[in-house]
Amino acid sequence: MHLLLIKIQELLSRSTKERVNISEDIIEQFGEDCKTAFRKQFTEERNKEFSIRMSSIGKPLCQLQMEKNKSSSESPPYNFKMRVLFGDLIEAAAIGIMKAAGIKIQSEQKEVHNELSGVKIKGTYDVEIDNKIYDIKSASPWAYDNKFAKGFNNVKEDDNFGYVVQGSLYSDSSGKPFG
């Protein structure tokens, strides 16, 4: 088992039995990250100009072309914003828990750029730990059991969402390996 996961599981297990000390700085940062996520999803202006982001690489090409050409598409379902917000909040909690577990995060939420065939692609990776880039993903129990729990090779073989390419672009852009 990976050392990072062991540290996280140890903290979480201990917290079920006793009070754990978490610094006020970590708690305050978690609160700020949650406020930022809420504002981002509900109150910030949306960029109307099309651009490919590293996180959208897994979308079907025809969908990206329609977005670029401003073709009308169906509105996302009413619960779409909640799913995206939950992902942001889980990410904030995961980072706070990693810090509380004593994991040294070298950088977080860092914007990176890459150029492919003359097209500038932006992205924001989640965390850098031990000079490696990691991307935090939230998943339903089904997705976890059937995709992520089976390891990286399983994700690589059936990567409908472009996670492997996304991680590779973060890695290439930062000059650091993908964890």
Give residue spans per PLM region.
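Metal-dependent nuclease catalytic cores in nucleic-acid-processing enzymes
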Residues: 92-101, 155-179
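Metal-dependent nuclease catalytic cores that hydrolyze phosphodiester bonds in DNA/RNA
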Residues: 1-133, 140-157
